[in-house]
From Swiss-Prot:
This is Small ribosomal subunit protein bS16c. Coiled coil: none annotated. Keywords: Chloroplast, Plastid, Ribonucleoprotein, Ribosomal protein. It comes from Daucus carota. Belongs to the bacterial ribosomal protein bS16 family. One of its GO terms (cellular component) is small ribosomal subunit. GO terms for molecular function: structural constituent of ribosome. GO terms for biological process: mitochondrial translation. It is found in: Plastid, Chloroplast.
Length: 78
């Protein structure tokens, strides 16, 4: 099963997250299937590759709670 979840990047005390499609059995820093966006909580910026996200959602990928909230904020879900 594939999930859309956050992968931590950046440096200490300055986290930036990549939004990735990843196998549910992989750990957080494991190998991802595809990078579909990023989220910077300090600057409150995000970039979403909407066609790639919709592709994975159509294939049955489940977003985590935080990713679901980001997608709702960006109005990917109506």
């Amino acid at each position: 099963m594939v999930k859309l979840r956050l992968k931590r990047c950046g440096r200490k005390q300055r986290a930036v997250y990549r939004i990735v499609a990843i196998d549910v059995r992989s750990r957080r820093e494991g190998r991802d299937l595809r990078n579909v966006g990023f989220y910077d909580p300090i600057k409150n910026q995000s970039y979403l590759n909407v066609p790639a996200i919709l592709y994975f959602l159509e294939k049955g990928a489940q977003p985590t709670g935080t990713v679901r909230d980001l997608l709702k904020k960006a109005e990917v879900f109506k």
